[in-house]
Amino acid sequence: MPTINQLVRQGRTVEVVKSKSPAMENCPQRRGVCTRVYTTTPKKPNSALRKVAKVRLTNGFEVISYIGGEGHNLQEHSVVLVRGGRVKDLPGVRYHIVRGSLDLQGVKDRKQSRSKYGAKKPKAK
């Protein structure tokens, strides 16, 4: 416990909270252009080919973001919407690409959790 004199001389230091998605600059989403679309492998103990894209954002940041869902239509120069949110088993991937927005189509034939994958409501028979 500091004395009053110590507090007068030094004061309390405020803890600085570090952002988990610095490239967003406090925005909910950011637009960007894909510079590279590729697959990568997750860290142990998982095994797969995860689809990721390197995206140059409108604020100049270059980030690696994850493409969720089964199948996608992304290529180089595709314009995408990026949101925060990391992928636990892919080191360095701290962003997600929003499905069904701008150049990225929603997941085809998706019946459940449709809003997360940009899928339209199926036609009722």
Swiss-Prot record:
The keyword Protein transport does not apply. The modification 3-methylthioaspartic acid is found at residue 89. InterPro entries: NA-bd_OB-fold (IPR012340), Ribosomal_uS12 (IPR006032), Ribosomal_uS12_bac (IPR005679). Keywords: Methylation, Ribonucleoprotein, Ribosomal protein, RNA-binding, rRNA-binding, tRNA-binding. This is Small ribosomal subunit protein uS12. With S4 and S5 plays an important role in translational accuracy. Part of the 30S ribosomal subunit. Contacts proteins S8 and S17. May interact with IF1 in the 30S initiation complex. Belongs to the universal ribosomal protein uS12 family. Residues 105-125 are annotated as: Disordered. GO terms for biological process: translation. GO terms for cellular component: small ribosomal subunit. One of its GO terms (molecular function) is structural constituent of ribosome. It comes from Delftia acidovorans (strain DSM 14801 / SPH-1). Coiled coil: none annotated.
